[in-house]
């Protein structure tokens, strides 16, 4: 008896879906079957959307955001406060803060957090480009909106040290972000409160 229940194309779809965070082999099979059942209304539009993303999505060369233009729509928005940069670990955190609609500032995506055990040091993150933005622009405040984890706090302290010779105010998110919590899982009200009550480092 063959160990493959379906054809190679369907098996490949299941294997790729299983790589998505939150999906396992069983949930990937269920998702694949659902997509196949909804071929015209979901599978085909999803395939077209994925192909469009492959063709058009890029990383913003200024802040590290994901968009279909470079610079991204946030960096091109003239209504943003050019003197304030919110530093986040990942694009998911940027999107979470944007949903809170509290501060119309600029962003800087680090692309992760310092984690020596995982081999992630300063050279693997977008820290040098952050320093360059401070050098080249009249930045007055850096808001460190990193996750309240050991690695996140280590990253915050490292960035603070790197910017210690500049006359820039450095703040971090205050109450509302639980220790060990990650921004993408917080509700909009909690994020808004944390931004409003940020504190100096």
UniProtKB/Swiss-Prot annotation:
PROSITE patterns: RECR, TOPRIM. CDD domains: TOPRIM_recR. One of its GO terms (molecular function) is zinc ion binding. Residues 83-178 form the Toprim domain. GO terms for biological process: DNA recombination; DNA repair. Belongs to the RecR family. HAMAP family: RecR. May play a role in DNA repair. It seems to be involved in an RecBC-independent recombinational process of DNA repair. It may act with RecF and RecO. This is Recombination protein RecR. It comes from Bartonella quintana (strain Toulouse). The lineage of its organism: Bacteria, Pseudomonadati, Pseudomonadota, Alphaproteobacteria, Hyphomicrobiales.
């Amino acid at each position: 008896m063959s160990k493959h229940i379906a054809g190679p194309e369907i098996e490949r779809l299941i294997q790729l879906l299983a790589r998505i965070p939150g999906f396992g082999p069983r949930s990937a099979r269920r998702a694949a079957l659902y997509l196949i059942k909804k071929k015209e209304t979901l599978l085909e539009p999803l395939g077209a959307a994925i192909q469009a993303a492959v063709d058009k999505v890029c990383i913003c060369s200024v802040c590290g955001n994901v968009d279909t233009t470079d610079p991204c729509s946030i960096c091109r928005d003239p209504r943003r406060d050019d003197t304030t940069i919110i530093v986040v670990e990942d694009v998911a955190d940027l999107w979470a803060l944007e949903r809170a609609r509290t501060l119309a500032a600029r962003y800087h995506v680090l692309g992760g957090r310092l984690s020596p055990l995982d081999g992630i040091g300063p050279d693997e993150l977008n820290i040098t480009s952050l320093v360059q933005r401070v050098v080249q622009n009249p930045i007055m405040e850096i808001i460190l909106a990193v996750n309240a984890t050991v690695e996140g706090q280590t990253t915050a302290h490292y960035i603070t040290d790197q910017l210690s010779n500049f006359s820039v105010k450095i703040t971090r998110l205050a109450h509302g972000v639980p220790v060990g919590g990650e921004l993408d899982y917080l509700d909009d009200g909690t994020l808004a409160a944390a931004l409003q009550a940020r504190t100096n480092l």
